[in-house]
Amino acid sequence: ESLQTRYAEGGDRAFDCEFMGRKLFFKALNFTSTPIEDSEEAAETSSLGRHLDGCRIGFDLGGSDRKAAAVIDGKVVFSEEIAWDPYFQSDPNYHFAGIRDSLQRAASHLPQVDAIGGSAAGVYVNNEVRAGSLFRGIPDDLFEDHVRRIFHRVMEAEGWADKPWDVVNDGDV
């Protein structure tokens, strides 16, 4: 039995087909066979973290708290944990306001913001939420307009969209 058949609608891996294909990458999974000599070279990966120069904000969004820190040239000048309960909140503004609040609180301890890095459980592609347990309470009809680009919206609201920033899975940090 071919992978294409197993990972198709109605196949025994239909859930994976829907999740990995349409939910994460907005298209159906497609499998092709290629001789090894014709395969593409591995892409370069980008390095995460270890950038200590300048005025930076780091944050981590968990299921019970939000953590944020402000750093100037590698020295922590502010660090805070704030309790929150995002899992079953159905209003995406709860998440937006909480994320924004943590970043603002950290930024208030810096003369300027040079870069931002964040993490949370889930799948993030190009700083967009594709799937995340923090957003499980958001109805599907609100997800696309209010959650998928939530980090872009926060950066734009704060005037930081032109700064270097990344949001990644917390296991990647």
Positions of PLM-derived features:
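Cysteine/selenocysteine-centered motifs that mediate thiol-based redox chemistry or coordinate metal-sulfur cofactors
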Residues: 106-113
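Short glycine-rich, Thr/Ser-proximal phosphate-binding strand/loop in the N-terminal lobe
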Residues: 61-101, 105, 133-137
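Short, small-residue-rich loop/turn micro-motifs
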Residues: 72, 120-122
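Short amphipathic alpha-helical surface micro-motifs
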Residues: 39-40, 51, 99-100, 145-150
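Glycine-rich phosphate-binding loop and adjoining helix at the ATP-binding site
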Residues: 2-30, 85-97, 115, 122-173
